[in-house]
């Protein structure tokens, strides 16, 4: 059995996972009755809501219904935990009104302090307190004291750092290392500026990715499928054949920006034989997806058509109408069948579309609604594509992208593959399979989609993460998040504008409460166990669980919302458990964006391990390993899949901030020594993930990057 480098002890029956619970920890402290495993309240490390609330059914828990009594662990390791799980359970809810910013209930209490329609609460409930009290006596992990030595990091130049890596490779991939939205654009821009980097390509996924770029004049462009290098003269940008594209949306939302700005893209942008996202794919997404589970860009349905070989590609639009018509008729059967099964009329679909757009954010475009209204839908699509694509003089040039990229590398040029989404959002990662996108957005997926010869051409991956405020948008498990992933959407909070502006608006006070009260023993190494207490934050609008307060305050203060959907992202701690797997699979290089945010924090938290805990004592079998209460999952251990991760809670190492020595580009002198807090944070991340940190972001501008000497 291999030994981990920091000497973790193992459960004899399950290599790599130790157990932190002993019978004495829960003896005499019975947990209160609970709903079916998986229900969760809206708070940091989210215990199921109290009995008087109601619960939302979730299919994930059906896979592990066997009740398991608490058993004495074979190995005891010292740590503390509280429960963290998304809304699961089998109980159906009573009728409880959803949260409304300025409403009061019959008792006069603000509904922000009531149990919401999802079963979530804004305050800390009694069950949370009970569970925390039952577990608080567990002792700290020794790893909380690592690393023993803090490295000193010296700044170096772009040419002596990133450019040396570029020059040693043929294919450079910039890939997200968490759940998307990591700030990859800045690294993409830095690579694209290298003189030998002539080709920038998007090779898979679709318009569900989004990024904001600026040209030299400071003009803002929001691209979804278009590569970021479009604004750089002399660069060729490609959209490869494994991408999926709604060509109407692409013209109306992306190409129009170039036209309006007077940018000639004729020799800069080339499109391969992409799979086409049709209006019915987007409607299938709307009709078949749970709230907050999709960008409504038709990704899962179009990838289904692609795999079934039923859809259309771009070449079909540019050839005879009869073939196009036949393929559309066949592929549309899925949409028409769903309407029949759900007993929906065209008018019902139109109504749902308009409801989705009712807050002013256009999630369902007009032409998609027009398709839903059309009597002869196939003819509507044939005419739509004929007018908006085939006969559109502004539609970009088409080419064999695979051939062009291959030829460029043979000429000695460098190819940049711009990764959409991220490693953990890849459909090829089984750990989060149910809540991922539909393409393989790992670095391996990028290289495969590019069809570049991986034995002939040297490739390298630049992984990108973000801290503080690592974030995820959409549903799914994320143990290091401040609240459940569906916390906002469950209360019909679709955009940042839907958050009451006065709620948890004082970020300074919220983060101070988190680190002072949420980790009451943070300055006592013998007692700090890395588990966040379910304390409350109060302002003039009410009381909030500290996780809720941090989630709201972080989203507002950092402007954390999806570039495509505008959904508030759920922030949390930098997660070394997940990051370790990313670097072990995709290579050691890591760049951390937005680190200047740390200038405003008293402390910065880093998740170094998880602890599995389910209040009902239920166990989860993942890949033949049975996770039970008290099991510790360290960085470097196998990462379990979501049924277990829903019950995993972060063990957080705290690092002192650097308020007195800010690193923001506007405040820092170039080549000034980095503050000790920054060095300790970077040392901690490198220690637990085996990564090599190439650079850190310290401002909003493209060149606000501090490159680190290796």
Curated annotation (Swiss-Prot):
Cofactor(s) required for function per UniProt: Mg(2+)
Gene3D superfamilies: Adenylosuccinate Synthetase, subunit A, domain 1, Adenylosuccinate Synthetase, subunit A, domain 2, Adenylosuccinate Synthetase, subunit A, domain 3
Binding-site residues for IMP, renumbered to this chain: 181-184, 208-211, 295, 309, 421, 437, 567
Residue numbers annotated as active site: 181, 211
Keywords for the protein's UniProt record, in alphabetical order: Cytoplasm, GTP-binding, Ligase, Magnesium, Metal-binding, Nucleotide-binding, Purine biosynthesis
Location of this chain's protein in the cell: Cytoplasm
Pathway of action: Purine metabolism; AMP biosynthesis via de novo pathway; AMP from IMP: step 1/2
Keyword Nuclease: no
GO molecular function terms noted in the UniProt entry: adenylosuccinate synthase activity; GTP binding; magnesium ion binding
GO biological process, one term: 'de novo' AMP biosynthetic process
Signal peptide per UniProt: none
InterPro entries per the UniProt record, alphabetical: Adenylosuccin_syn_GTP-bd, Adenylosuccinate_synth_dom1, Adenylosuccinate_synth_dom2, Adenylosuccinate_synth_dom3, Adenylosuccinate_synthetase, P-loop_NTPase
Binding of substrate, residues: 563-569
Renumbered residue ranges of the record's region Disordered: 1-53, 84-110
Binding residues for Mg(2+): 181, 210
Function: Plays an important role in the salvage pathway for purine nucleotide biosynthesis. Catalyzes the first committed step in the biosynthesis of AMP from IMP.
More about this protein: Parasitic protozoa lack the de novo purine biosynthesis pathway and rely exclusively on the salvage pathway for their purine nucleotide requirements.
Protein name (record): Adenylosuccinate synthetase
Species of the source: Leishmania donovani
Gene: ADSS
